[in-house]
From Swiss-Prot:
EC class name: hydrolase
Subunit comment: A double ring-shaped homohexamer of HslV is capped on each side by a ring-shaped HslU homohexamer. The assembly of the HslU/HslV complex is dependent on binding of ATP.
Family membership noted in the UniProt record: Belongs to the peptidase T1B family. HslV subfamily.
Gene assigned in the entry: hslV
Native source species: Stenotrophomonas maltophilia (strain K279a)
Any one GO molecular function term: threonine-type endopeptidase activity
Subcellular location: Cytoplasm
Top-rank taxon: Bacteria
PANTHER family: ATP-DEPENDENT PROTEASE SUBUNIT HSLV, METALLOPROTEASE TLDD
Protein name according to UniProt: ATP-dependent protease subunit HslV
Annotated GO CC locations: HslUV protease complex; proteasome core complex
Gene3D superfamilies: Glutamine Phosphoribosylpyrophosphate, subunit 1, domain 1 (3.60.20.10)
Main location: cytoplasm
């Protein structure tokens, strides 16, 4: 089945990461959807990880798979202590371990210097413009964040929050209950 047609996959959230100046923010909505039913409106899908909480992470995808990825990424981060190294090591594991290859989730991760997407195929992608948007409302949030970056002086936190709000107005799998973490 095409993932876009599966009611249990990638329809649970929108995450956006915005980097502006010396600041980076990751925001996520709070809606959890199972099939065509909203199960929860205040889920927390954005977290601080690593020593002293210096890495931000947000997940989109099947909930159990996303939590598994969070745990695996956090273990790599604790072991290697550096965002890019942890992401690459997780991607290596993802490509070699069968159980990981079937996980249907994406992670957006960021520290003070770097923002990355860790994809469901084990790819590690660094955006060229400092903006990441994943999940069911990702395209809407990405468009909103890019417009706000280009035409306003808003800070990273505000842009991330507004982008989720705009996505929440358009995407039925996203709400306006926004959680933001910032470095």
């Amino acid at each position: 089945m095409d993932p876009s047609q599966n009611p249990n996959v990638f329809h649970a959230t929108t995450i956006v990461c915005v980097r502006r100046g010396e600041h980076v923010a990751i925001a996520g909505d709070g809606q959890v959807t199972l099939g065509h039913t909203v199960m929860k409106g205040n889920a927390r899908k954005v977290r601080r990880l690593g020593r002293d909480g210096q890495v931000l992470a947000g997940f989109a995808g099947a909930a159990a798979d996303a939590f598994t990825l969070f745990e695996l990424f956090e273990a790599k981060l604790e072991k290697h202590g550096q965002l890019q190294r942890a992401a690459v090591e997780l991607a290596k594991d993802w490509r070699t371990e069968r159980r990981l290859g079937k996980l249907e989730a994406l992670l957006a991760v960021a520290d003070k210097e770097t923002s990355l997407i860790i994809s469901g195929t084990g790819d590690v992608i660094e955006p060229e413009d400092g903006i990441i948007a994943i999940g069911s409302g990702g395209s809407y949030a990405l468009s909103a964040a890019r417009a706000l970056m280009a035409h306003t002086e808003l800070d990273a936190r505000t842009i991330a929050s507004e982008a989720i709000g705009i996505a929440g107005d358009i995407c039925i799998y996203t709400n306006r209950n926004v959680v933001v973490e910032e470095l």
